[in-house]
Amino acid sequence: DPNVAFYSVVAVICWQYIPFYMIFFIAALSNIPQELYEAAKIDGATQGQYFWRIELPLLTPSIKTACILSLIGSLKYFDLIYVMTEGGPSNATELMATYMYKNAFASFKMGYGSTIASAMFLIITTAGIFAYFVTRRKEE
């Protein structure tokens, strides 16, 4: 079933990367100075205000970095999907990387596979540069 294949791959990828992002965000949270929480407590802030006015603004660079890592990682993901489904039933889990591999090495269309790999390189590089310019800090 294509739906089962897709959701099983998503579940395994989440299982693989959630610990990384948990440690990433725990490290970012531990870098928030305790003085900010103490000052907010003295000012009478609620738990919601702690999150919206202290934590979220200070976690924004970490959130942006995590989004960039997720975006670029998802564009070049290959090994797990190929091992689990080889592109899946009815191409349900087909990615550019698995499509490139099938054309270049299974069908021996090296030129076409090379073209797909070049397109992947351009897309990933463009996405990375775009994400860099969107998320960089504005210097004042």
Curated annotation (Swiss-Prot):
Which PROSITE patterns does the entry mention?
Answer: ABC_TM1
Q: How does it sit in the membrane?
A: Multi-pass membrane protein
In this chain the ABC transmembrane type-1 domain maps to 1-133
Coiled-coil annotation: which residues? Answer: none
Q: Give the highest taxon in the source lineage.
A: Bacteria
Instruction: Give one Pfam family, short name only.
Output: BPD_transp_1
Q: Which CDD domains match?
A: TM_PBP2
Locations listed in the record: Cell membrane
Keywords linked to the UniProt accession: Cell membrane, Membrane, Transmembrane, Transmembrane helix, Transport
The residue ranges crossing the membrane are 9-29, 65-85, 115-135
A GO CC term assigned to this protein in UniProt: plasma membrane
The yes or no answer to whether the keyword Transport is present is yes
As for family, the record states: Belongs to the binding-protein-dependent transport system permease family. MalFG subfamily.
Q: What does this protein do?
A: May play a role in sugar transport.
The protein here is known as Putative ABC transporter permease protein ORF1
